[in-house]
């Protein structure tokens, strides 16, 4: 079992994911990891046709676990929360190309018609003022033209509102005031709405501060830690 876990981590590039999270923890004060989730992975496979004797391409698919690194710039927790356990919800921002949005139609529980409608409405991404500096671009105009902004919500939702949005609930859940959901929105369209699949329900993120700030959600990184000492030395 231990060897299988190590192999799965290696195949899913978990080391690179952890490196990115640790880098942001040191630089910005907080690293964020999402998951684990299962994804369909395709592997090349050829099968000999018994009639023709020729090899035919027949890829195999299997479910594999995967974790993701989420940038602090794309992670919006409940503003009243100090830790993830206190958070009522979190929102993650995705910036996808047109083909990436279209690929969502092949993933489970995504609404194909809503995705098509969102694509027909055109790109919705607008760069924030700080992003040109972060990405070292003089202009983001060309980048903005072909990108779609998708907001992924994890948290509680009013039961009646969830049912109006097309979420099917079991009979024993109709009396609940709120339900835990995962909702994806693009161009104002709900492209995915499902119940939180985890038991017990939880927010599928791990937040790792470099140095804990007891009164804020995000931690303190190395540059902020060094700021006072560097100011004194420069003075």
Put a short name on every predicted segment.
Residues 1-235:
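Extended alpha-helical, oligomerization-prone segments that build pores/tubes and scaffolds
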């Amino acid at each position: 079992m231990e060897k299988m876990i190590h192999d799965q981590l290696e195949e899913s590039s978990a080391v690179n994911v952890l490196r990115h999270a640790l880098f942001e923890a040191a630089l910005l004060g907080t690293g964020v990891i999402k998951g684990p989730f299962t994804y369909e992975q395709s592997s090349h496979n050829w099968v000999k046709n018994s009639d023709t004797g020729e090899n035919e391409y027949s890829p195999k698919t299997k479910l594999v676990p995967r974790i993701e690194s989420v940038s602090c710039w794309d992670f919006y927790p409940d503003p009243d929360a100090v830790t993830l356990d206190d958070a009522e919800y979190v929102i993650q921002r995705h910036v996808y190309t047109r083909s990436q949005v279209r690929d969502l139609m092949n993933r489970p529980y995504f609404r194909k018609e809503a995705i098509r409608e969102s694509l027909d409405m055109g790109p919705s991404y607008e760069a924030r003022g700080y992003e040109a500096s972060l990405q070292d671009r003089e202009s983001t105009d060309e980048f903005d033209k072909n990108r779609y902004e998708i907001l992924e919500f994890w948290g509680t939702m009013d039961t009646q509102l969830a049912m109006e949005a097309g979420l099917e609930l079991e009979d024993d859940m109709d009396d609940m005031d709120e339900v835990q959901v995962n909702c994806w929105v693009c161009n104002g369209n709900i492209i995915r709405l499902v119940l939180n699949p985890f038991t017990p329900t939880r927010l599928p993120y791990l937040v790792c501060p470099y140095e804990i700030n007891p009164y804020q959600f995000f931690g303190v990184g190395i540059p902020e830690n060094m700021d006072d000492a560097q100011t004194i030395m420069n003075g």
